[in-house]
């Protein structure tokens, strides 16, 4: 199994955090990583390991993005004006799979990616099957009519585990939402602390 397809719960155990705030996460029951060496006594982490962990958490949260793609987001964040760490968060939250997840059309980022890849989502009325597609402010994201009664969508909409953030607007009856604005870090409802500034430090070494 590739690292990108690694079980979401295995990612939680490896990182030692409940990345998506799911009630079923094994991290809620155990405080050590997966495998036979998971219970070893932890040493004081180095600056490098802290920065690496911050990067792995952010990559993992968005569906275990590949290193190549994640680095592209970082490089683009550097090129843009303003704070690099905020730019990075803004780019990640503009991914279509992230927006579909925020709109509660999918229960996890992994499910969102698969849902989009299978052609169940439109942007401004046109089918888009690329999870990494970057939406723009004002874009309208909708579940296709033929997909609105799928159990995966209905289950996600009804889950009480999370709310939709203020930078998206959603009508769950019509399965339609609008991306209102690009968020900053403080807007994003991460269940765990994300530290994009440490990601910037990691790549700036």
From Swiss-Prot:
Q: Name one Pfam family in it.
A: S4
Tell me, in a sentence or two, what this protein's role is: One of the primary rRNA binding proteins, it binds directly to 16S rRNA where it nucleates assembly of the body of the 30S subunit.
Instruction: Quote the CDD domains the UniProt record gives.
Output: S4
Stated name of the protein? Small ribosomal subunit protein uS4
Record the organism. Answer: Gluconobacter oxydans (strain 621H) (Gluconobacter suboxydans)
Give the highest taxon in the source lineage.
Answer: Bacteria
**In its keyword annotation, does this UniProt entry include Ribonucleoprotein?**
yes
Query: Domain S4 RNA-binding: where?
Result: 94-157
Region annotated Disordered, chain positions: 26-46
Q: Which SUPFAM superfamilies match?
A: Alpha-L RNA-binding motif
Q: Name one GO biological process term.
A: translation
């Amino acid at each position: 199994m590739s690292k990108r397809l690694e079980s979401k719960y295995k990612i939680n155990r490896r990182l030692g955090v409940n990345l998506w705030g799911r009630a079923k996460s094994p991290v809620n029951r155990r405080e050590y990583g997966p495998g036979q060496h998971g219970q070893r006594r932890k040493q004081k982490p180095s600056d490098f390991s802290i920065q690496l962990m911050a990067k792995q958490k952010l990559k993992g949260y968005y569906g275990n993005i590949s290193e190549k793609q994640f680095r592209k987001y970082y490089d683009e964040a550097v090129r843009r004006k303003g704070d690099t760490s905020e730019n990075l968060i803004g780019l990640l939250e503009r991914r279509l799979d992230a927006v579909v997840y925020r709109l509660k059309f999918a229960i996890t980022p992994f499910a969102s990616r698969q849902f989009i890849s299978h052609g169940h989502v439109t942007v401004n009325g046109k089918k888009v099957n690329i999870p990494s597609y970057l939406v723009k402010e004002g874009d309208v994201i909708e579940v296709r009519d033929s997909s609105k009664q799928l159990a995966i969508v209905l289950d996600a909409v009804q889950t009480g585990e999370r709310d939709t953030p203020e930078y998206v607007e959603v009508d769950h009856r019509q399965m339609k939402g609008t991306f209102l604005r690009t968020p900053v870090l403080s807007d994003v409802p991460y269940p765990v602390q994300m530290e994009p500034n440490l990601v910037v430090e990691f790549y700036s070494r």
